[in-house]
C-alpha cells in the first residue's frame, strides 16, 4: 500500500529512474528488515483519555477479511467541520476501537440485528489527529497535511507502528481531509 500512493505521483520517467537506481544497489538478504525511518516512526498522537464521554460514535464498519468490527469516534471539532462540509481543522481527532467478531458454529462472524458483526474482544485502538506543524518532517510524497497516526494496545500504550502505511493509505483521500 505504501508504494501505491507514491507511484500514483510519479511519471513514467520517474519510475524508470527509481528502478535504475535500485538496480545498481546490493540486494538485501531474505531475512533483512529495515528500521522505520525516525520521522515516520514518531507520532505526536496521544491516547484520548475520556473519549467515551467526550467523543461521539459516528460510524461502524465490518472487516470480513480479518473478522473484525470497528467503531469510529470523533471529537467535537472534527464533527462540527464535517457537518459543515469543511476540511477537518487542527485539533481534530478520529479514534477507532478494533474488535474481533464473535464467530458462529460455522466459524463465520455473527451478525447482530443492526447488520454489523457482533463484537467479541477488544484487539487494539487506532487514532488519527492533526495539529499545526505535525507534518513538517514527513516526506511530501506521503504527507497528509499535518495528520499523524497511531495505534494503541488495549492497555492504551502506544504500539510501534510504521506511520508510512497509514500515510500512504490516506494520501489519496485529500479531498476528504485524508479520512
Tell where the protein language model's regions lie, with residue ranges.
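N-terminal post-signal-peptidase region of extra-cytosolic proteins
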Residues: 68-84, 108-113
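Compositionally biased, charged N-terminal/linker segments
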Residues: 34-77
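Intrinsically disordered, low-complexity Ser/Thr-rich linker and spacer segments
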Residues: 27-31
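Sequence context surrounding c-type heme c attachment/ligation sites in exported
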Residues: 1-15, 33, 37-41, 45, ...
